């Protein structure tokens, strides 16, 4: 199983970051406004902000680290996107809304998005639901650790396992994300995980043709059962809108997942670096409801 996890850990994406002209001084070279970065699927976009600022610092029209009157965030096709989701999860959802798939997800991704294209923008106020990009170097770490506290509680019924980590272990845990140390990550995360979870930390995101994300976090009990995705179809899908399994593909870590997959097996193999299992629902062309409702 660790071989699968390491393949996911080592997975990377090409990210193209375009800088809004409002950041730059007049007369700045056009090429400085576009950065191409190779980014792990299992990290946050905001972890690359020091790199981005450093690349454009000589051309900035202000100091983003001290300007408290401006907010910064990312967009894709003029739609705000959250930095607080793993990069791979964002890619899966953005690829999902770029086309209605008739062939395999993997082939469509190659055609639709050579790069994860994002735009760094700023404004006097934030779009709804978007967490601002802060100058603090610990912003991502604090958010990520909070995610793991939630995961620990969902799995075990308490946060004792993660709160019992020593200071050095907690530093080592986050350090494994930054330095890409897979063995350290597995060592610490295994102390938090459970072979008999009470519930599965699950987040569902749906690609909508409007360009927005629909996010849900169903509570899936694992007490005495190990359901397949088909068994919990009603929890995964928005049954009120008449959506069923024939209308969507289930994507996890860029892979199309069959409905007969056991939920615990899926979680054990494909959970993300923040402890959650992210499932992206992608509309299938010709589905009864997919085109009109999602």
Swiss-Prot record:
One Gene Ontology cellular component: mitochondria-associated endoplasmic reticulum membrane contact site
Keywords: Autophagy, Isopeptide bond, Membrane, Protein transport, Transport, Ubl conjugation
GO molecular function: Atg8-family ligase activity
Gene3D superfamilies: 3.10.20.620, Autophagy protein Apg5, helix rich domain, Phosphatidylinositol 3-kinase Catalytic Subunit, Chain A, domain 1
InterPro entries linked to this entry: Atg5, ATG5_HBR, Atg5_HR, ATG5_UblA, Atg5_UblA_dom_sf, ATG5_UblB
Numbered residues of crosslink Glycyl lysine isopeptide (Lys-Gly) (interchain with G-Cter in ATG12): 149
Subcellular locations according to the entry: Preautophagosomal structure membrane
Membrane topology: Peripheral membrane protein
UniProt PTM: Conjugated to ATG12; which is essential for autophagy. Conjugation with ATG12 involves ATG7 as an E1-like activating enzyme and ATG10 as an E2-like conjugating enzyme.
GO BP term (any one): protein transport
Main location: membrane
Reported function: Involved in cytoplasm to vacuole transport (Cvt) and autophagic vesicle formation. Autophagy is essential for maintenance of amino acid levels and protein synthesis under nitrogen starvation. Required for selective autophagic degradation of the nucleus (nucleophagy). Also required for mitophagy, which eliminates defective or superfluous mitochondria in order to fulfill cellular energy requirements and prevent excess ROS production.
Subunit text: Conjugated with ATG12. The ATG5-ATG12 conjugate forms a complex with several units of ATG16. The ATG12-ATG5 conjugate also associates with ATG3.
Family: Belongs to the ATG5 family.
Note: Small amount of ATG5-ATG12 conjugate is enough to perform normal autophagy.
Protein name: Autophagy protein 5
